[in-house]
Amino acid sequence: MASNTVYTSLIGLLVALTVRSIYRVYFHPLRKIPGPKIAAITHLYQHYYDAVKGGKYIWKLDELHRKYGPIVRFNPNEVHIQDSHYYHHIYAGGAKKQDKDPGFPAVPLFPGVTVTTIKHNHHRLRRGIIKSFFSKQYVTGLEHVIQSKVNLLASRFTEAYRHGTVLDLKYVFAALTSDLTTHYVYGTNLNHLAEPDFKNDFLAGMDSVGPWIPVLLVFGRLLKLARYLPACLVPAGEFLHLWTLSERRVGEILDSQDNGTMGDQKTLLQAMATADVSEEEKTATRLQMETLNIIAGGTETTARALAVGVFHLAHKPSLLLQLRDELRTVMPFPDSSASWTQLEQLPYLAGVVNESLRLSFGFIIRSARVYPNDPLVYEDLVIPPGTPISQSAYFVCMDPSIFPQPEDFNPDRWVQAAREGNNLHRYLIVFSKGSRHCLGINFALAEIYLAIATIARRFDLVPYQTTVEQLQMKRDLGFAAPEKGPFTVRAKVTGLAD
């Protein structure tokens, strides 16, 4: 009897899977979108390249586009478009409603966070709570804090020169960005810049979990369990230590609010805790999730852009010398400082900053948008409402029709484009675009401008056991990753500029 029940269940399952497969291929709303039938039938096709191959699905996507064209249905429910000129239609601004894809793996891990908020109106409310803290005016008011940390960083470069120390630029610049971001959010200083080897448990945690990202993308909902495991049992145990720190800081702020001892200092966390919104938007869990996410986003991406930029200046001394000549117009002496506003006006420096961002790629994982009410039209194909649609930032950053010889670090391309009135910034999409673009863009740009200007004006550097090829993307681990190991950029300070 039991065997008959099992047999009947298996037959029923087989029939159900067959019916579902037929529906997805021949009757699904996306049936007219080009792509392999196996991808239309099952997510396992995508999961194989993500989880088994280790972050290689981005290259399979590229292959599918070469075969099927610029629009591809790459899993049963989602469409990918590889057309740089169409990017702004997917990641649009204005009042047009666009939701987050509820299937995005980070949604269950970071509930209550602005960037993972699914519904358009709810996202707009949460974004509005913190938006003013990321305005250019507000960031400019904190420029003295950024410059003081950059000066401390420069003193560490001088120390490295005197002792012949090899610098891991990602960790060096992450010390700067994590200290600044944590100060911005909590009003406290983790003081990574004072660590002898720029020790950063948070970044070490991100490096540890990196190889697991493709697997976690497949089993996204299991990520929630990681929060309840002892740090010693989790590959990124160091990451969870920051979780504990954020928990404590949020508790302190809420306690000070309750007993009236918060004081006049206004941090991002305090602004969130005192915002005129419903209490469910100010729970300890949501405040912790939101602030932790901001620190994560503000640490690695900006540090990576700085590491990429400084590496290329070290790799091609002619670029560094050209930049230094320009910097002398506003920074006549090595220890001179210039404002962010002054630095933004320097064309070659702007080109260096833009190339640093472009070739660091930002957050490259597909982050689909869903238009709940409106269809999108691409060429002669109608993408129905409710369809997750994405475009990887990597393909825009490396589009040879926009950026000729895209693998080259070429600041002059931006100088020439500005001279000719060609708006290349339209395709600098490392902060995304539209109503859900990264709020931290102004803070990140201020850090990058001030840090690159200071380092380039004061120091000569050479790469150390790092090649251009090692910076090229081979795997999609959320961030661009080399074939093996974490992203690493090392250099030595060889001289002090005059």
Curated annotation (Swiss-Prot):
Q: Which InterPro entries match?
A: Cyt_P450, Cyt_P450_CS, Cyt_P450_E_grp-I, Cyt_P450_sf, Cytochrome_P450_monoxygenase
Task: List where in the cell it is found.
Answer: Membrane
Q: Name one GO molecular function term.
A: heme binding
Q: Write down the Pfam families for this protein, in alphabetical order.
A: p450
Q: Which residues are glycosylated?
A: N259, N354
Binding-site residues, heme: C438
**Name of the molecule in the record:** Cytochrome P450 monooxygenase aflU
Q: Which organism is it from?
A: Aspergillus parasiticus (strain ATCC 56775 / NRRL 5862 / SRRC 143 / SU-1)
